[in-house]
Each structure stands twice: as structure tokens, then as C-alpha cells.
Amino acid sequence: MNGILKKRLTLFIMLIIIVIFAILLIINETHLFDNQKTHSFNEAVDKQLGEGTLNMTEKNGRFVEASKTDVKKAMDVNNDKDNLNHMDISEKISMSEKEVNDILKDKGILKNKGEAFLKAQDKYEVNVLYLVSHALVETGNGKSELANGIEDDVKHYYNFYGIGAFDENAVHTGSSFAKKQSWTSPERAIMGGAKFIRGNYFENEQLSLYQMRWNPKSPGEHQYASDVEWDENIATFMKVYYDKLGIKKDHINKDYYL
């Protein structure tokens, strides 16, 4: 009988230790997560409007400087818009080359580039529907001047992600960046864009479109675009394809601020 009691007591003590360990682990993870929040929402808005930041919005067919109201509305994580701009896009999703090419069938220079997009996803672990949607937004559905290649020294240079394309002279600066990177084919531009996004944003813990645009940990710094609707515009494209293909929307996080 004493042996049975000792075994039960030992088991009981072990269970208590496991429960305590689990509680401490939860508390520790919560504490670590909270420590990643650096600003309240209003503080983040103020920093985003600080000196040296650029916030643009499209009105009447042209880009103008965004007002504080425009910025605050765009940064609001509790708006009624879809949540895909808050989804982790640093993970691969399962798609066939045919499915990607079906999306691209009437998309200009991007037509039949499904294989390249999937290779970029596999090599750099960047969500392929994000890559496609971002490219479509930046290139006007594959038909913009920059998308179709800028000729220089007999070669054409391509830039599908607006990388290095500053607002005041997007075609010139975007093509110059593409030339420096030797993006001499659509495939190279797709692969190079994915590499750039992985290395410059995902490795900086900016894993969602919202984080790439607004950088909640360091508002006003290291942001992909100046357009206040940039993340929502790409997310709108993504939603169409996610819904059409019935792909699950995983790892959505909107808890950025104190």
C-alpha cells in the first residue's frame, strides 16, 4: 500500500511541476510578445507623420501628400477591410504551375511566368500569391512601361516590384536599380524581387504587408512604399485569388500596438 501511495504522490508532484512549467512558459511568451510592441497606435501615427517621412495618397487620378486623417485611417487595424494585409506572407502555399498561369493568362509580360513565380516561392519562401499580386499591382497588370523592360545598352531591364522606383521618377530609378541587379529577363526580375523582399523585410521581422508598409516596431522607418493604401491594394488582389482557389488564410496577426 505504501508503495502505491508513493507512486501516486510522485505522479502528483510531477503533474504539478508540469502545470507550473506550462504556466511559466505561457507567461514568458506573453511577456516576450508584449516586449515586441514599442508604441501605442497614436504614438505610431505621430511618428509616421514626423519629419522625413513620406505618405502619399491617390486623389483624382494623381498622387498627393496624405493628410493625418488619411494616414490614421490607413493605419487603423480595426477597420472593416479584409485581413490579408495582416497575414504572414513569409510562408509557402501549395499551388500548381497551371493555377498560377491561369491568373497570369492575360497579364502582359507576366503571362506564362508561373514557373518563375513558383521557383521564387520555393527558393526564398515568399508566398507565391503575394508575389503575383504585388507584381500585378506594381506593373499595371503586367503592362506598364517599367514592367515591359527599359532598354539600355541594347539590353532590357525589368522591375516587377517597384524596388528602387522612387515616386518622383519611378521609371528611371526603377530601371537603374534593375540594371544594377542585372535583371535582364522577367524571370530574373521575379527571382530577384523575391530575394530582395526576403532579405530586406522578412529578415527584419516585417512579415505581413501591413508590417512592410507601416513597420509598427519602428514607425516611419524602413517602409516599402509611400502610398498609404499600398498594403490594402495588394491584399485586395490576393483576396480574389484566395477566395477563388479556396486557400486557407493562415497566421493573421493585428496585435501590433501597446
Language model segments and positions:
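Pyridoxal 5′-phosphate
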Residues: 138
